[in-house]
Amino acid sequence: MDPESIMAADGTDSAPANGGLAMENVCVKENGAVSVETVDTTSESQNENSANSSTLDTIEHVKEAAEGTQVEHVDDSKCMKGEKAQRKPRHEKLSGGKNNSSVHIKKSKEGKSADAKVAASNGSVAPNVQTTNPLKSKSFNGREAQVTKQGKHDSAPAESADGEKVKPKSQKKQAHETSEDDTQSSNSPKADDGKPRKVGALPNYGFSFKCDQRAEKRKEFYVKLEEKTHAKEEEINSMQAKSKETQEAELRMLRKSLNFKATPMPSFYQEPQPPKTELKKIPPTRPKSPKLGRKKTASGADSEETQTPRLGRLSLDERASKDNPTAKGIMPTVDLKKQPVRKSLPRLPSQKTVLPDGKPAPAKAAIIPAKVRPEKKKLEKDAETVNQTSHPTEEEAQVTVSSNADVEDSHETVSPRMNEDRADKSIEVSEAVAVEH
């Protein structure tokens, strides 16, 4: 780049080797101190982070200087002359085909904004950093964009008025360009595939998490657990049903096998039964004669009654028998017992005797032996002899005879065995009577 492109107020020229632009604004104050301001527009940081940090630092320094110092503005006329002198050679070199990057850069509006000197309170001059306002200078931002599109250029060291060399820095991108790119990328985000992505959606990173795989494994595990629990519940239900059936069957068998033994109720719980009336049995048929209804005791009593007066009568003759026991031929009772007893058979109805009254003779008369009849005759003879002494004896004899006849009549209808027994008794009685007489 030609030295005419850069013009200072004091007439010093500095030209970088690579065509980069370095501006030096030197202003002389009253105290004679010189402040040198160098702004390297083409040499910026290599990466975006350094450019952003540098711009932030310059803004902070400007604020601090404004608060603690007084800023004095230089006349715009001097700066405008230098800028006009710079524009003419730039247009000439654009037609010649040289590097366009350093030519198109203008500092017209920067000159308007400020080449300022900071004067301290003690009168010393502090170096003032020239800052750019991107909001005011739209044209400058557009030109910077054109410079970045053409390529990267390394700035050569520039010589200042004092003979110092400034080392230019390699520039990759400007801070404004990076900020604009960031805003464009934030406004219109695109995925790796080039498709527009929704605002708020997560970007598609190159790696994948294992959460999905773990979720699938969890689902499979829970499904298996549910199947196991269902199988266990079914087994438990089946076992309970079987146990109920077995219990019911056992209960039925027990009910069939059980035999309850009831104890009898005690008697005091029961009401006493009413007393039963004993009914006498009436015989179905009447007896043939009133003699059949008589008892043996009654017949025995009659016989005893008949014998008692006889004994009383015989007691009168006991004295005579005691005086002459052999005269009357009394036999001992032992001999009478030793004599054999004759048993008579019952007679047939044709053999029965008939009494003079027209009644049949009793069967007892046939049973009595023939010896009894002479004894009766003897009794009658004795009665006649006794009549001489007393009449009542005859009457008693007749009573005895009639009683014997009644006894014989009463035993007519008795069974043959009873007849035999009574016949034996009558024989003994007759023998006893005979012995007494």
Swiss-Prot record:
Residue ranges the record marks as coiled coil: none
Modified residues (Phosphoserine): 208, 415
Biased amino acid composition, Basic and acidic residues: 58-86, 151-167, 408-437
Disulfide-bond pairs as recorded: none
InterPro entries: TPX2_C, WDL5/6
GO annotations of cellular component type: cytoplasm; microtubule
Tissues in which the UniProt entry reports expression: Expressed in seedlings.
Skewed-composition ranges (Low complexity): 41-55, 360-371
Domain of life, source organism: Eukaryota
Region (Disordered): 1-22, 38-210, 254-437
Keywords, comma-separated and alphabetical: Cytoplasm, Cytoskeleton, Microtubule, Phosphoprotein
Comp. bias (Basic residues): 288-297
Biological process, per Gene Ontology: cellular response to ethylene stimulus; microtubule bundle formation
Biased composition regions of type Polar residues, renumbered to the chain: 121-140
Keyword rRNA-binding in record: no
Compartment list: Cytoplasm, Cytoskeleton
Function according to Swiss-Prot or TrEMBL: Microtubule-associated protein (MAP) that regulates the orientation of interphase cortical microtubules.
Entry similarity comment: Belongs to the TPX2 family.
PANTHER family in the record: PROTEIN WVD2-LIKE 4, PROTEIN WVD2-LIKE 5-RELATED
Protein name, as recorded: Protein WVD2-like 5
Species, as recorded: Arabidopsis thaliana (Mouse-ear cress)
Lineage: Eukaryota, Viridiplantae, Streptophyta, Embryophyta, Tracheophyta
